[in-house]
């Protein structure tokens, strides 16, 4: 009797465990999910956020997956710019959020009060400045100045964070032992807030790029304005995707916001590559056959990793870039490339078969848009469509590289794709007429046929430029073809 009772109890417990495994995840309100009755499910948390966009409050409600929750980006508010809440019960994000209202204006001051308020601090600052100058003329100040360590290096913070390790060591340790999604949030903030900006090295759609120094190491700092918070947030989110790190994808270091009470800067810190973008590199340099193959192979390797889904508990979703061009690819010291600027990227959830398209009004670069994007025939409900559009753009980048390859002393001057067919800043209509209606593609010079490497590269380009996206090569196929070419040409990629 006792044995039968124990057996029945064991079966009941197994049934309860099975039911728990099959139970649906957390249900949340999702304002972006009109196809699923504005509802989504997740194993992470429900998310509600209100942000200031063009002077108006914009509300977003959605699900946060466990990897995204662990990245600690979603549940973070910034002063007067966003208010964000994460919660963990069904439909708990069905709430109304508002940005904090400014405190009521203080009563107006009269002329006498204003004069006192202005005069007193100015006098005090003047006295303090005079005392400082007088003190620094003395021997004691001179001695300290000589013996003082470099003020640009906040050594205590450096020692606290890295303990003798380089940034690459820190990132490798976290990638090898943790989630693979980047440094902990506290370390990111410590790094970002102890960086000394050196010089501006570029400007883009979303802000400026600076060369910075942290503990004697070079870093790149992409600075967004507060009105582009959505772009900063999206790019930081993509860069912190689990298992994204790859030698041919720009190495992400930190994301942080700098708020001094009057304005907010949003920082994205990454590895610094002094050679600059591929566009700048090709304008300055001629490449050898081996150099061309190294550049092309590294781009294909980075894109293949981006496009590939890694299945597992520490897996990576497939990602499409959506803005591949020579200005968004950086050249490293070793003459290989790293794909950058992931702010427009999309992620594919193969389990739910959904595409995480960013709510961003900015699109890719018109000159590099695939035919199906120009004539609006692209099926945005199929993730493969985005990968195929990337391949078309890569073909154009390869054309830019191959033109600068010197064979027998013959080399073409650097030009952008379609330079002889459209103006310097073409419209979508102008690109559609050339690419879709007239079906033109960049010309491939006849002299490329005399060089095996250029002949293979020309064939790859043509197979990337097919009007039918399904007929184009995959990034992995391109990588394998160029790898074989690398072996034939005996180049060390």
UniProtKB/Swiss-Prot annotation:
Entry-linked Gene3D superfamilies: CD59, Phosphorylase Kinase, domain 1, Transferase(Phosphotransferase) domain 1
The signal peptide here is: 1-20
- Tell me the residue ranges located in the Cytoplasmic compartment per UniProt: 135-493
Source organism per UniProt: Homo sapiens
- Membrane topology summary: Single-pass type I membrane protein
- State what protein this is by name: Activin receptor type-1C
Provide the alphabetized UniProt keywords: Apoptosis, ATP-binding, Kinase, Magnesium, Manganese, Membrane, Metal-binding, Nucleotide-binding, Receptor, Serine/threonine-protein kinase, Signal, Transferase, Transmembrane, Transmembrane helix
Per the UniProt record, which EC number(s) apply here?
2.7.11.30
The GS domain is annotated at: 165-194
Q: In which tissues is it expressed?
A: Present in pancreas, heart, colon, small intestine, ovary and the hippocampus, medulla oblongata and putamen of the brain. Isoform 1, isoform 2, isoform 3 and isoform 4 are all expressed in the placenta throughout pregnancy.
- Transmembrane feature ranges: 114-134
Stored PANTHER family = ACTIVIN RECEPTOR TYPE-1C (PTHR23255:SF58), TRANSFORMING GROWTH FACTOR-BETA RECEPTOR TYPE I AND II (PTHR23255)
């Amino acid at each position: 009797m006792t044995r039968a009772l124990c057996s029945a109890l064991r079966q009941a417990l197994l049934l309860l465990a099975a039911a728990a495994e099959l139970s649906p995840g957390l249900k949340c309100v999702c304002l972006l999910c009109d196809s699923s009755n504005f509802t989504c499910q997740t194993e992470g948390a429900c998310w509600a956020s209100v942000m200031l966009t063009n002077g108006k409050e914009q509300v977003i409600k959605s699900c946060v997956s466990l990897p995204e929750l662990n990245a600690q980006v979603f549940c973070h508010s910034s002063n007067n710019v966003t208010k964000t809440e994460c919660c963990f019960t069904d439909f708990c994000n069905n709430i109304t959020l508002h940005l904090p209202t400014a405190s009521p204006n203080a009563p107006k001051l009269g002329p006498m009060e204003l004069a006192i308020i202005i005069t007193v601090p100015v006098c005090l600052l003047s006295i303090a400045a005079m005392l400082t100058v007088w003190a620094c003329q003395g021997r004691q100040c001179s001695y300290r100045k000589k013996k003082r360590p470099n003020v640009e290096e906040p050594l205590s913070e450096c020692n606290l964070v890295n303990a003798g390790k380089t940034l690459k060591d820190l990132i490798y340790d976290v990638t090898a032992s943790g989630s693979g999604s980047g440094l902990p949030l506290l370390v990111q903030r410590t790094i970002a807030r102890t960086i000394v900006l050196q010089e501006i090295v570029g400007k883009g759609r979303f802000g400026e790029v600076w060369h910075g120094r942290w503990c004697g190491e070079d870093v790149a700092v992409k600075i967004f304005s507060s009105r582009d918070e959505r772009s900063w947030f999206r790019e930081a989110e993509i860069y912190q995707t689990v298992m994204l790190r790859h030698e041919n994808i720009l190495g992400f270091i930190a994301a942080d916001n700098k708020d001094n009470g009057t304005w907010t800067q949003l920082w994205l810190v990454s590895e610094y590559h002094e050679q600059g973008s591929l566009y700048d590199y090709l304008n300055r340099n001629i490449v050898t056959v081996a150099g061309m193959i190294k550049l092309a192979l590294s781009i294909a390797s980075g894109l293949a990793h981006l496009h590939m889904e890694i299945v597992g508990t520490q897996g990576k979703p497939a990602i499409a870039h959506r803005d591949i061009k020579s200005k968004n690819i950086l050249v490293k010291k070793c003459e290989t490339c790293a794909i950058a600027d992931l702010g427009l990227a999309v992620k594919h959830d193969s389990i739910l078969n959904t595409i995480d398209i960013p709510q961003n009004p900015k699109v890719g670069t018109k000159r590099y848009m695939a035919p199906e994007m120009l004539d609006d025939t692209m099926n945005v409900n199929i993730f493969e469509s985005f990968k195929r559009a990337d391949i078309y753009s890569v073909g154009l980048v390869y054309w830019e590289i191959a033109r600068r390859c010197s064979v027998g002393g013959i080399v073409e001057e650097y030009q952008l794709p379609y330079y002889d067919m459209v103006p310097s800043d073409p419209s979508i209509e102008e690109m559609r007429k050339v690419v879709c209606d007239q079906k033109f593609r960049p010309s491939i010079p006849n002299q490329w046929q005399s060089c095996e490497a250029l002949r293979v590269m020309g064939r790859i380009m043509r197979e990337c430029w097919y009007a039918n996206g399904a007929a184009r090569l995959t990034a992995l196929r391109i990588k394998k073809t160029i790898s074989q070419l690398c072996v034939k040409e005996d180049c060390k990629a």
